[in-house]
């Protein structure tokens, strides 16, 4: 199953990229949402190959996932690999500078089933793809707004024009 979303952010691509690779902030966000995060000892802390083991409560069960950074292109692209017992996939975040102070963030998410149960679940999601797509777009817009707020605060403004 493939999903995409995009949003425009009033911040330079370098600032958006720095926000997206802030591992500590992402770990706090995931923990706030109820997941457990573990940094595997056999993976680097930053850069390509860095990863996290997640235990995520989903539909009444705890799902275990391994998320790793597969590729980084500074100020342009991040690629994450996702592996679980039932699914695998990838997430690609691309940054397109629109102007020196504006960046378009594009997210492409692909999830592939590894088991029959996962295939049935993804087929069910395909039936509700409109809702799933809308939720993803909303999350990406919220991420963009959060990065804009961080940028405004870093420049000493309150975000009001």
Feature map (PLM): residue ranges:
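Hydrophobic ligand-binding cavity/cleft-lining segments
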Residues: 1-47, 161
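Extended beta-strand/beta-hairpin segments
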Residues: 2, 97-98, 118, 152-161
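Short, surface-exposed coil-to-beta transition loops
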Residues: 2-4, 62-66, 87-92
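Beta-strand elements of well-folded, non-transmembrane domains
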Residues: 9-11, 58-60, 111-115
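A short, structured loop/turn motif at beta-sheet edges
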Residues: 13, 45, 70-75, 94-104
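Glycine-rich portal/gate segments that line the openings of hydrophobic small-molecule binding cavities
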Residues: 28, 38-85, 138-156
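Beta-strand/loop substructures that line and gate deep hydrophobic ligand-binding cavities in soluble
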Residues: 81-134
